[in-house]
Amino acid sequence: MEKKNHPSQVAFEDSFASSILSKNPPKKHRARLYMTGTGINGFTENEILFHCRLSSGRNYPNELERKLNIELERLDEPNPDGIGSHYRYRFKTAQDVQKVINLINHCAEQGKYQPVSKALTDNILSLYPTE
């Protein structure tokens, strides 16, 4: 005897739900958005891990430098325990940050997830010097 699924038992596969719910952004999107939002204070790899809930933040700054042909400022900071040090990365200008935001929006468009809004872009850019 063949069992038939009743409509209430079948998973709802309508595209309506997917059209109104935004797709979760990938790790790179979250990391890049965090990095741009830190302003002149900059960020460390550990801060990327903590704020974006990632397991590794090591290559995100270097990848941006290679992809966008920009150079991040690196400040060597001693660790709180006095053993070793780590880098604090900072974007130098608002133009560099605009390149990152353009990359974020380009990837968001391709991946069909939420891009950076104009208002948020303006807020982020106001955190950086223009030259």
Q: What does each model-found stretch correspond to?
A:
Residues 102-131:
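Amphipathic alpha-helical dimerization/coiled-coil segments
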